[in-house]
C-alpha cells in the first residue's frame, strides 16, 4: 500500500501502474475538505515512488465522485473573500498536482462524476466511462460556476461550444454523448472498466498514445481564430441569456469566464475562474439555490427515514378517474406500483386511461420510453366500476369530486371493502382531514394526500396529518409518495393545509390592488419579470380555474374570517359570476385560443377590463415596489404563521413546499430564505407601512421579537 486514509487508498498494480481508489465512509464519495487533503497527500506519496509509470483513478463505490460537499458551502461562502480564495487556490493546486504528474494518468468512471468529480477526471490524461456513468458540471444550478478548473479544462478538451452547453445548462451527460464530443475516450461495460483504463495506460506508457500532447492542449490557450471566437461567444451569450434571464447570473458569468480565459494559459485562466467563482459565491442567488439543494436533501432524508416505519406498499388504488385520477394512476404505475382505478362511470375510466396513455405516448415520442414499457405501465393500471379489485390495495387514494359529503360517503364505502390494515388517503386541496375522518371507523389509518395538478409535472405532495392519523399511516403515505417520484412534505390539518393557505393571502393582495383600480396584466408583468414567478396572479388563477379559486377562497374565508373574510365582491367573484372560468372555458382575466401546437394561447381581453371597471371604477397605476409588497406581504406573514402554529415543521420544508408546489422563484429560495436575505427587521418595517390594509398585513409578535434580536430563520 502506497498511501491509505479514511477516504483514499493507493496501491501498486502489476506493470508499475498505481491505482488510487476513492472510498470514503458513507454511500458516496465527495470532495470535502478531508478528501481534498487526502488527495494532496496521496499525490505526494505517489510522486515519491520512483518506479510508478502510470496512475488510474477509481472508486470503491457504485459511483465515482458526486461533487464537492455542498453542506460545507454556505459556511464557507460566508467567509471573507481572502479565505474563500485561499480554499479555491488550495483545491486547484491539488488538481494541478494531479495533472502535472510525470507519467500518464487515467480515470475509470462509473456512476456519477459531477462537479468536482468531473473536474478531477478532466485533470487526468485519459477518461474511460462505463455504461452507468453520468458526467457533468451542475454548478450553475447552484448559482455558481465550476471552481476546480472546470471552465478552463473542459473547453480545451471538448471545444468551447460544447463546453459552454455543458456548463451553462448544468445537465448530466450520458456516456455515449460524452464520447461523441470527446469528453471520454471510451465507453465499456462495467465489468471491463478498470481493465480498459489500465490497457489505455499501458498503451500510453508504450508511446502508442500521445498523453503529453493531450496534456499540453489543456495547459495552452484555446485554438480558436479571433473572428470565430468572437462570433461563438456572442452567440452563446444571446442563447444563454434567453434561457437563464437576469435573475440567474451564473450561466452568463460562465460564458464570460470561458471567453476571457480562452487566450490564456492554465495559470492565468484559473485566476479568472477563481475571481468569478468568489464573486458568484457571495451572491444572494447562490445562497438561495444552495439552500434549496440542502432543503431538498433534508426533505428527502425525512422521507427516507419515514420509510423505516412505513408499511410496504405493493399495490394501490385510486377512487375517481378522470384527469386527476388518471394522473395519479399513471404516476403510480410508471414508478412500479400497480394500481386499480375505480370510478362509477365508464366514460370517466376511459378518460383516466386516456390520460395515462397520452402521457406515456408523449414519453415514447420523445425517446424517453419504448412501446414495450408503455404497454407494461398500462397493464399496471386496472380499471374497475366496483370495489372488488380494490380489496387487495395497501394504499387507497380517494380522488373524487371536491365536495365534503361526496368524499365522506366514498370514504365510508371503501372502508367496508379494504383490508383491516389498508391505508386510506384523501386527495383534497381544501377539505379538513379531521372533518373527513369522522366518516371513518378507523380514522388512525386515514390522512390527506394532496397532489398538485398536473400530477406528472408537479413534484410536491402534501401529506396531511389529521388528529387521529397514526405514525405508520403518515410514514406509509410519505414512502408511497417518494416511491411515486414525488417530494412529500408532512403538514398538519388546517383550512387550505399549507400551500393553499399561503397562496390565497397572495390572491387577496392581488384582489386588493384590483379593487383600487390596478391593471391585472401590469401586475402579472411585475410579478413575473421582476419578482420571478412563472405566472402572475391573474394568469395563475386562469390556469387553476376561477371556479376552483372561488370555492377555495370561500373555504379560506370561513376558516380564517378575521384575516381572510370578505366584505364584498372581489375580482375573483366578478370573473366567476360572469362565467369567466379561465383556460378551461377560454375566458378568464385573459382570453384563450389554441395555438398551432395545440397549447392555450393567452391574449388581453377588453371584456375583462370592462367588467372590472364596472365593479371597481377607473384604472390606477401602481409602481412595481408597491405591487410586490401588497401581494407578497400577506403570503409571507401567512407562511410564518404556519411555522409558528406547527402546520409545517421547519423553514426548510415550508420553502420546499413553496418552490415545488407553487413555483416560488428558486433564485429567492422560498419565503424564509427571502426573509433572511431581506432582513426580518426590514420586512417588519415594510409590512407596518401596509398594516392599515388589514389582518393579512399585520406581522406576528414572534416576528417582531426576531426582528428586534436581529435574528434569522435559517442558521448559517
Swiss-Prot record:
Active site positions: 450
Cross-referenced InterPro entries: 3-OHacyl-CoA_DH_CS, 3-OHacyl-CoA_DH_NAD-bd, 3HC_DH_C, 6-PGluconate_DH-like_C_sf, ClpP/crotonase-like_dom_sf, Enoyl-CoA_hydra/iso, FA_oxidation_alpha_subunit, FadB
Site (Important for catalytic activity): 119, 139
UniProt-listed PROSITE patterns: 3HCDH
A matching Pfam family: 3HCDH_N
Naturally occurring in which organism (per UniProt): Shewanella sp. (strain MR-4)
GO function terms (MF aspect): 3-hydroxybutyryl-CoA epimerase activity; delta(3)-delta(2)-enoyl-CoA isomerase activity; enoyl-CoA hydratase activity; long-chain-3-hydroxyacyl-CoA dehydrogenase activity; NAD+ binding
Annotated region described as Enoyl-CoA hydratase/isomerase, given as residue ranges: 1-189
Cystine bridges: none
Quaternary state and interactors: Heterotetramer of two alpha chains (FadB) and two beta chains (FadA).
Catalytic activity of the protein: a (3S)-3-hydroxyacyl-CoA + NAD(+) = a 3-oxoacyl-CoA + NADH + H(+); a (3S)-3-hydroxyacyl-CoA = a (2E)-enoyl-CoA + H2O; a 4-saturated-(3S)-3-hydroxyacyl-CoA = a (3E)-enoyl-CoA + H2O; (3S)-3-hydroxybutanoyl-CoA = (3R)-3-hydroxybutanoyl-CoA
UniProt keyword list: Fatty acid metabolism, Isomerase, Lipid degradation, Lipid metabolism, Lyase, Multifunctional enzyme, NAD, Oxidoreductase
Similarity comment: In the N-terminal section; belongs to the enoyl-CoA hydratase/isomerase family.
Superkingdom field: Bacteria
EC number(s) stated in the UniProt entry for this protein: 4.2.1.17, 5.1.2.3, 5.3.3.8, 1.1.1.35
Record function comment: Involved in the aerobic and anaerobic degradation of long-chain fatty acids via beta-oxidation cycle. Catalyzes the formation of 3-oxoacyl-CoA from enoyl-CoA via L-3-hydroxyacyl-CoA. It can also use D-3-hydroxyacyl-CoA and cis-3-enoyl-CoA as substrate.
HAMAP family: FadB
Name by which UniProt lists this protein: Fatty acid oxidation complex subunit alpha
Pathway(s) the chain acts in: Lipid metabolism; fatty acid beta-oxidation
Cellular component terms per the entry's GO annotation: fatty acid beta-oxidation multienzyme complex
Chain residues that bind NAD(+): 324, 343, 400-402, 407, 429, 453
GO BP of this protein: fatty acid beta-oxidation
Keyword NAD assigned: yes
Ligand binding (substrate): 296, 500, 660
Amino acid at each position: 500500500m502506497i498511501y491509505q486514509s479514511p477516504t483514499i487508498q493507493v496501491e501498486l498494480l502489476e506493470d508499475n501502474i498505481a491505482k488510487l481508489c476513492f472510498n470514503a465512509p458513507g454511500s458516496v464519495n465527495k470532495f470535502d475538505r478531508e478528501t481534498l487533503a487526502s488527495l494532496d497527500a496521496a499525490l505526494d506519496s505517489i510522486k515519491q515512488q520512483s518506479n510508478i509509470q502510470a496512475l488510474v483513478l477509481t472508486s470503491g463505490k457504485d459511483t465515482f465522485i458526486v461533487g464537492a460537499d455542498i453542506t460545507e458551502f454556505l459556511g464557507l461562502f460566508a467567509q471573507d473573500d481572502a479565505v474563500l480564495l485561499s480554499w479555491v487556490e488550495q483545491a486547484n493546486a491539488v488538481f494541478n498536482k494531479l495533472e502535472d504528474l510525470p507519467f500518464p494518468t487515467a480515470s475509470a468512471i462509473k456512476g456519477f462524476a459531477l462537479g468536482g468529480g468531473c473536474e478531477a477526471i478532466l485533470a487526468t490524461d485519459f477518461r474511460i466511462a462505463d455504461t452507468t456513468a453520468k458526467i457533468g458540471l451542475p454548478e450553475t444550478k447552484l448559482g455558481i460556476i465550476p471552481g476546480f478548473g472546470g471552465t478552463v479544462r473542459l473547453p480545451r478538451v471538448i471545444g468551447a461550444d460544447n463546453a459552454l452547453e455543458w456548463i451553462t445548462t448544468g445537465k448530466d451527460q450520458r456516456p455515449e454523448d460524452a464520447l461523441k464530443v470527446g469528453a471520454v475516450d471510451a465507453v465499456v461495460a462495467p465489468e471491463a472498466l478498470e481493465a480498459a483504463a489500465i490497457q489505455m495506460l499501458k498503451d500510453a506508457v508504450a508511446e502508442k498514445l500521445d498523453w503529453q500532447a493531450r496534456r499540453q492542449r489543456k495547459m495552452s490557450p484555446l485554438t480558436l481564430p479571433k473572428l470565430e471566437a468572437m462570433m461563438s461567444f456572442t452567440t452563446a451569450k444571446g442563447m444563454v441569456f434567453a434561457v437563464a434571464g437576469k435573475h440567474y447570473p451564473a450561466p452568463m458569468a460562465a460564458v464570460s469566464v470561458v471567453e476571457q480565459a480562452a487566450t490564456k494559459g492554465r495559470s492565468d485562466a484559473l485566476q479568472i475562474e477563481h475571481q468569478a467563482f468568489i464573486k458568484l459565491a457571495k451572491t444572494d442567488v447562490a445562497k438561495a439555490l444552495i439552500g434549496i439543494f440542502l432543503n431538498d436533501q433534508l426533505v428527502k432524508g425525512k422521507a427516507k427515514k419515514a420509510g423505516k416505519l412505513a408499511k410496504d406498499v405493493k399495490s394501490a388504488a385510486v377512487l375517481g378517474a378522470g384527469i386527476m385520477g388518471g394522473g395519479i394512476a399513471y404516476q403510480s404505475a410508471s414508478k412500479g406500483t400497480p394500481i386499480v382505478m375505480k370510478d362509477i362511470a365508464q366514460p370517466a375510466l376511459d378518460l383516466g386511461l386516456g390520460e395515462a396513455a397520452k402521457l406515456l405516448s408523449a414519453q415514447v415520442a420523445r425517446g424517453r420510453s419504448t412501446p414495450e414499457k408503455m404497454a407494461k405501465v398500462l397493464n399496471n393500471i386496472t380499471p374497475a366500476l366496483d370495489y372488488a379489485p380494490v380489496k387487495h390495495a395497501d394504499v387507497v387514494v380517494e380522488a373524487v369530486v371536491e365536495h365534503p359529503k361526496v368524499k365522506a360517503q366514498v370514504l365510508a364505502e371503501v372502508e367496508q371493502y379494504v383490508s383491516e390494515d389498508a391505508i386510506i388517503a384523501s386527495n383534497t386541496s381544501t377539505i379538513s382531514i379531521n372533518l373527513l375522518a369522522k366518516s371513518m371507523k378507523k380514522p388512525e389509518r386515514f390522512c390527506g394526500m394532496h397532489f398538485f395538478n398536473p400530477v406528472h409535472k408537479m413534484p410536491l405532495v402534501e401529506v396531511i396529518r389529521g388528529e387521529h392519523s397514526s405514525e405508520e399511516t403518515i410514514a406509509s403515505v410519505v414512502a408511497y409518495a417518494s416511491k411515486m417520484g414525488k417530494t412529500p412534505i408532512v403538514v398538519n390539518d388546517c383550512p387550505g393545509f399549507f400551500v393553499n393557505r399561503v397562496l390565497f393571502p397572495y390572491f387577496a393582495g392581488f384582489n386588493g390592488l384590483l379593487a383600487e383600480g390596478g391593471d391585472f396584466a401590469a401586475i402579472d408583468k411585475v410579478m413575473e419579470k421582476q419578482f420571478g414567478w412563472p405566472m402572475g396572479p391573474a394568469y395563475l388563477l386562469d390556469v387553476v380555474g376561477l371556479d376552483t379559486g372561488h370555492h377555495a377562497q370561500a373555504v379560506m374565508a370561513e376558516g380564517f374570517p378575521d384575516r381572510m373574510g370578505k366584505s364584498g365582491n372581489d375580482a375573483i367573484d366578478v370573473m366567476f359570476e360572469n362565467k369567466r372560468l379561465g383556460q378551461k372555458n377560454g375566458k378568464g382575466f385573459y382570453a384563450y385560443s389554441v395555438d398551432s401546437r395545440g397549447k392555450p394561447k393567452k391574449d388581453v381581453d377588453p371584456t375583462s377590463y370592462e367588467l372590472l371597471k364596472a365593479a371597481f371604477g377607473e384604472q390606477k397605476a401602481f409602481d412595481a415596489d408597491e405591487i410586490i409588497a401588497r401581494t407578497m406581504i400577506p403570503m409571507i406573514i401567512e407562511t410564518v404563521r404556519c411555522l409558528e402554529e406547527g402546520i409545517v415543521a421547519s423553514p426548510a420544508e415550508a420553502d420546499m413546499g413553496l418552490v415545488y408546489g407553487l413555483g416560488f422563484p428558486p433564485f429567492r429560495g422560498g419565503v424564509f430564505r427571502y426573509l433572511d436575505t431581506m432582513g426580518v427587521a426590514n420586512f417588519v418595517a415594510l409590512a407596518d407601512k401596509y398594516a392599515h390594509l388589514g389582518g393579512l398585513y399585520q406581522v406576528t409578535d414572534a416576528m417582531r421579537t426576531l426582528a428586534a434580536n436581529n435574528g434569522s430563520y435559517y442558521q448559517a
